[in-house]
Each structure stands twice: as C-alpha cells, then as structure tokens.
Amino acid sequence: MSSALIADNIAKVRETIAECAEKSGRLAADVTLVGVCKYFGEEVTRMVAEAGLLDLGENRPQQLWDKALSLDTLPIRWHQIGHLQRNKVRRSLPFIHLFHAGGSMRLLVEINKEAERVQATQEVLLEINGLKLMHLEEK
C-alpha cells in the first residue's frame, strides 16, 4: 500500500463526508473521521497519519500501546474502540483521546477512577441499549 493511495482514499472519504454533511445541513468540520488501524502495522499507520488522518482507532489495547509509543512524534488522537477490560484502563488512559467502549458501569467507574487519579478528564462514548438499561444501574 502506497502513501499516495492512502492519501487519495482519505481525500475521497472526506469529500463524501463533506457532500453528506452539506445535504443534511451540517458542517463537515463537525464530523470526525476515525481511521481504524487494527489490521495494519506501524508502517501503514504512520502513512495514514502522515497523510493527515490523525484520529485513529484500535480495538486491541496492546497494539494501541505499541503504536502510540512508536508513533509518539505524530500528533495522533487515539480512539479505543470495542471492549476494554477494566484491568487495562490504567495502562491505556495516557494514550486515549476518546474511549468508544463505555458499555458497562463497572468499566465507566474504573475509567473515571483512573482519570481522577491522574487529574485528567477522559471523554467516553456511552453505549446505551434501551432494553438493557439495568446494566447501567448501580447495584
């Protein structure tokens, strides 16, 4: 995969986002494009970031940690997508711009506890299923 092909594909997706945003009366700037790099190694991930796509998602914490450390000279905003085990929150938090995995109260409490410990504010997307709201109730 070449840098030129990656940059061209990103540009095409951004054009589509701009067209759709305009049709819906929104601004393209209000839409965040997140490139999911879970099947790609460091080299391709670097090319994506160098092409200007700086919001990158990974669903495997170990790979996210490794990529974040090896690509730390690039201003990448890392997104943890998918499930995250509570025991990996402490190690993950320093790298994560946005958690897309707020599906359980126990995980949310752990993220909040760790964020408070390091005096940070952590953004999280909540997953809410109307049929399963009892999972968010405190017991």
Name each model-derived stretch.
Residues 1-139:
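Conserved alpha/beta-domain cores
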